[in-house]
Amino acid sequence: MKKKNKILIIIVFILIAIFLLNNRTTTLSFFKYYAPQKIGEKVKEIVNIFSLYKDLKEKHLNLQIRFNNIIDNEEKLPIYSEDEEKIVKIADKEFYLKTFSIPFFLTSKNLLAETFGSFYMDFYKKDLFVVSGNGLFSYINIDEFKKKESELITITTNIKKIIKYNEFYTESRFGVKDLLIIDDEIYISYIKSINGEKDCFNTSILKAKINFKKIEFKEFFTGTSFVCKSYVDFNAHSSGGRIVNYDDDNILLSTGEFLDRTKAQNLNNTLGKIIKINKKSSNYEIISFGHRNVQGLFFNKNNNT
């Protein structure tokens, strides 16, 4: 009986729809009477949202095209210093603080949010090295950096030959996680897509000799375990990635657990750990475990802490 009633209701709605479609005046009167008074405003809002999304999508595409063009070609990027300057006091020492704006690229699929990726920097002699979250390397001389307007010079790398999964270049939660320069060698930590495993990742390190024309990275350290997107709580933001110089022979790396919490407690993998890694052999030793997402890492050589 219930099934027959449902069929009858559907037939009635179909007949009404046919009648309305065949009588334009009646259709307009029907919608004018029954539609909400502010439906026009709502429609305009929806149209504006889609228009904004279209503009942002085009902007994102243009930025991505530009990124693809300059990552393999030397180019100068402008830096602008802000007018505001101030003195800050830290541990009884005064520091001169000045803000600079640097052009980087959209690295998020959430176009409406206009999320920008992170960037990392370290010093090499009299130059400041900078890398964006999506792998764009550049440098500037410190004396030039102090000027009102200056330029970053991009450096070509082989990053795109090593890191081929799309999220590295398009989503801020993936990508480069830190930069460390020791003597003439440069290290970057990043979220690595594990070969042979679909949508599975861990925190790893690339290493290269500094070269102002082209930096040729090689794989230096790869974690022994990974977490896949299929895991219910997977989150690439919880990846750690801080690198610091430890001693003459080793560096320290923090790794996250990608919210697979049990792996941080397991000493048979490298997730959710502080790891000591030999600079030459890349052999490692776990020195601390049970971490979710270590973002601050500092080693005090004076008291070995």
Place the predicted regions along the sequence by residue.
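N-terminal Sec-pathway targeting helices
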Residues: 1-16, 22-23
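Asparagine-rich low-complexity intrinsically disordered tracts
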Residues: 2-9, 38, 58, 202, ...
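Short low-polarity hydrophobic stretches
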Residues: 13-19, 39, 60-63, 243, ...
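Membrane-interface motif at the C-terminal end of an N-terminal transmembrane signal
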Residues: 15-52
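Acidic, Gly/Ser/Thr-rich repeat motifs that build Ca2+-stabilized beta-propeller blades
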Residues: 55-262, 296-299, 303-305
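Short loop segments at secondary-structure junctions
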Residues: 248, 279-280
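Loop-centered beta-sheet repeat module
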Residues: 265-277, 283-305
